């Protein structure tokens, strides 16, 4: 069975709405079913699936999922937002910028874009609307800024990329810091332009910030400090050599539980089981996709698909700039129609040999790949962030996407800079 037939069948399965994990399992088994002499028999595929999820680094994923849900229920995003509003709320575009900075910080806790949108958006979008910002703008800015959750470390997609390629999770986390901050700064620049052009209700904003400032900075800082230092604790443990990324993920769970239960008292003991069930429901589909993607990628390797694709592309595109642009366009399209996890696990083994052949650093490519797929979070038809944000405000998905287009433009500008200036990603390594 040819590789082309495998991918066509996979596309058909997706079009007729067969779940991604089942689709991957089907196409992983078929080559061996059609050719009994092929190494990848059904038993091989099953062993590959079990082997794919039997990974210590992979344990970080459910832990970060659980930590993110604990922090969402624990109102930690509210504490982060309050301190940023206190500091910059009265400035032009101060409130939207506070939303973006909150997404940056929350992304450094949860490692997930949809979780960032849900946690930050549920609290900030109603406030933005109350302060006079249009509902579609408020929804769009949270949906796009939520994409920073997969770029700023710790990042679940970076863990997936490390699993698929064997690269260092810690190095990938470091490489995501400057790109995440740069994209956040570009989004704030757009928010400033938007607010200068369309105006703000300064009277409402000043009243709201004044109410907050009446508490006093020390009181606000006292309430927020536990939320502010959480990324420092998680990332500090990793880079100080105290803990591996997986161990740091476990630390983040216990830290979130401790702060929410005993400091902020925003969750009760009897709610913990429900939170764990929610985390399991969130992670279970990811686990099945991980297992099936691993088996499928190993079958593709046995079929020599990475080598064949690499040889064909390098034979037809000798110019490095053109090649990188084509890969970026391809990844952008993939991000629009496929979830991040299977995209990373399937495409990384295929594309990495190609970019390495032109001298591109694997860590640098990992950042470029994740930024491409982060844009997919806010582009139809899949656009998970769009659907999460839409569920918070009832604004139609396409309206949010239309309002998000200028911000996506800044995301694309950042992508070009990251692609052709490797030092942005590799500076901290």
Predicted regions and their residues:
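Alpha-helical transmembrane segments of multi-pass membrane transport proteins
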Residues: 1-429
